[in-house]
Curated annotation (Swiss-Prot):
<dbReference type="InterPro" id="IPR050796">
    <property type="entry name" value="SCF_F-box_component"/>
</dbReference>
<dbReference type="InterPro" id="IPR006527">
    <property type="entry name" value="F-box-assoc_dom_typ1"/>
</dbReference>
<dbReference type="InterPro" id="IPR036047">
    <property type="entry name" value="F-box-like_dom_sf"/>
</dbReference>
<dbReference type="InterPro" id="IPR017451">
    <property type="entry name" value="F-box-assoc_interact_dom"/>
</dbReference>
<dbReference type="Pfam" id="PF07734">
    <property type="entry name" value="FBA_1"/>
</dbReference>
<protein>
    <recommendedName>
        <fullName>Putative F-box protein At1g77650</fullName>
    </recommendedName>
</protein>
<feature type="domain" description="F-box">
    <location>
        <begin position="1"/>
        <end position="47"/>
    </location>
</feature>
């Protein structure tokens, strides 16, 4: 590679603009590039300059779409993930993977996996309950690679932190007067975790955004929901299943949150809207409506079985102000298909790509089991 004879700062500037998938292909062929790809300074600088992708996880593979080029990278899921369901939390290109053992004595298994490098490490998790809540991040007052795992047991009313370097679990105290009802709806941002949560108590539940600060090891409510989290009746099979509006939480502009919502109106029309917050570090955090459109014929109607089978769609707002959405959309009674959408801020569909043809929507085994916004990286899992 002749360009590697250029000054090192010029070479790095070029490589920072090169997708990590391309660097991985070239890494074995060049000693200088190999050394850079193992240099933590370069790895984290490249990560901070990399663009977001969207990821969908299946039982046997993951798919990562580049929303700008529409290229899709398909990688196999480790054979060790021997379960019919599992979900993930993304942090710096690493995935905290949780799946449930088979049989009567069911408990969670945990592993940290980098799909790009293939590195995989298991985390001791004996007797973790299937309803436990997890988080994945790092303390901002220490080294960037000091990754930690949060575990919350509502049943045992206990909280623990796992340090990936020391490989030890450590308990800490917290008040658990809230619950996260959809743990697959998690957002990692700047080392911390964010979820959609509900208060617990005798009174009417209030929906709000809960956070966990890995530096202070404390939970903190960030803000309330921008609207009443309405519950509607939806007919499923021979019964009535109670579901909320389709809601997706995501990050926005590095230090803010965004919220996607699709609701069914009384006249069988659908409204799609996106809300964004100011900086989550501000003293008062509030929502502003970013986007709203009602019954646009080109926009998808999300698969109504999404939350029943954990197929939560994923989205983010691109720097061009477009909404990047990868979802299962309704495709006739009992069926869905998977499509990627780039939606302009006026509701126009700029790009659409069907990534999976029509399939049965109510629990098909080969369908997506989890999804997230993902930034590919070569970040190593701590030894």
């Amino acid at each position: 590679m002749a360009f590697l004879s250029l000054p090192s700062d010029v070479v790095e500037e070029f490589l920072f603009k090169t997708p990590i998938e391309s660097l991985v292909l070239c890494k074995p062929t060049c000693k200088q590039l190999y050394a850079l790809c193992n240099d933590k300074r370069f790895i984290y600088n490249h990560l901070d300059l990399s663009e977001e992708r969207l990821m969908r996880i299946y039982l046997d593979k993951i798919k990562i779409i580049n929303p700008v080029t529409l290229d899709i990278l398909c990688l196999p899921v480790p054979a060790e993930f021997d379960s019919v369901t599992f979900n993930v939390i993304h942090c710096d290109g690493l995935l905290l993977c949780r799946w449930t053992t088979r049989g009567l004595d069911r408990y969670n298994k945990l592993a940290v996996w980098n799909p790009i490098s293939g590195q995989l490490k298991f985390v001791e998790s004996f007797f973790h309950g299937v309803t436990d809540l997890y988080g994945f991040g790092y303390a901002n007052n220490g080294p960037r690679d000091s990754y930690k795992i949060l575990r919350v047991s509502y049943w045992r009313k206990e909280c623990e932190i796992y340090d990936l370097k020391s490989k030890l679990w450590r308990a800490f105290s917290a008040t658990l007067d809230w619950v996260v009802n959809t743990p697959q709806q998690n957002v990692f941002m700047n080392g911390n975790m964010y979820w959609i949560a509900d208060t617990l108590g005798d009174n009417i539940r209030e929906t709000f955004i809960q956070s966990f600060d890995f530096s202070k090891e404390t939970f903190k409510p960030i803000c309330s929901f921008p609207y009443e989290n309405k519950i509607i009746d939806t007919l499923i099979m021979n019964g009535i299943h109670r579901i909320a509006d389709s809601v997706i939480l995501s990050s926005f502009r590095v230090d803010r949150l965004s919220l996607f919502r699709q609701q069914r109106l009384e006249d069988k029309k659908y409204e799609m809207e996106v809300w964004v917050t100011n900086k989550v570090t501000d003293e008062v955090v509030s929502w502003t409506k970013y986007f709203n459109v009602t019954h646009h014929p080109d926009l998808p109607i999300l698969n109504p079985y999404l939350f029943t089978y954990m197929r939560v769609p994923t989205f983010f707002i691109h720097e061009t102000n477009s909404i990047m959405l990868w979802c299962d959309k309704a495709a006739g009674k009992g069926f869905a298909c998977t499509s990627f959408y780039e939606i302009g801020d006026q509701g126009e569909v700029k790009h659409q790509l069907e990534t999976r043809k029509r399939f049965r929507a109510n629990g098909e085994r080969n369908s997506c089991v989890s999804s997230c916004v993902y930034v590919p990286s070569l970040v190593p899992i701590p030894e």
